[in-house]
Amino acid sequence: TCDICREEDPERATILEFNADSSGRRVFATGLRNAVGLALHPVTNELWATNNGHDREGRSLPPEWIDIMRDGDFMGYPLVHSHQVWNDFEIEPYQRILPITDADRTLATRHKRPVALVPAHYAPMGIHFYTGNQFPTRYKNAAFVAFRAGKAKLSSHPGYMVSALFSTPDGSNATIAPFITGFQAGTTQDDVWGFPVGMISDDAGS
């Protein structure tokens, strides 16, 4: 997808669902600008996703999100972010969205509050649910999320870390905390030596 625009292809900025034999192709969820990480929750088997927001609304907007994807969901792009907060269409490149229609306003009311919001431009990548026993009990079924960007790019926050997302299986009562940090030694892009992207657990639970 583009930074913010009205997609001409109805399958852009979506999640598509297929049967195991590749038949039954259909749009499952819409309004995802850049959903990089996808994972099934080990308890509920629901699909979770990470999303990267647009870039021209400053260092603090919009927040990135992690959320559960359910059939028919509208996740906000290209109209709103956070929870039904309109994007800034006074920014010149975003004016191509205008005019905002009644259909847009109705669609925006379907935008749900995400399980978790994190600082703008953190660039959440992979999401991995931990089912091992190597870590303390609270990590069982928690989600590890990799963030490959932060302050050295556009964000006003450090970033460049792997965080642990704790919540109930339905996504409520979510909290997020750093798990692995130290990939950024200073404040510039040259000071970043690691860009976390994906994670996996081994049979030993590490």
Region roles according to the model:
Residues 200-206:
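Blade-level signature of beta-propeller repeat domains, shared across WD40, Kelch, NHL, RCC1
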Residues 2-6, 10-23, 33-34, 39-194, ...:
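Beta-propeller domain segments
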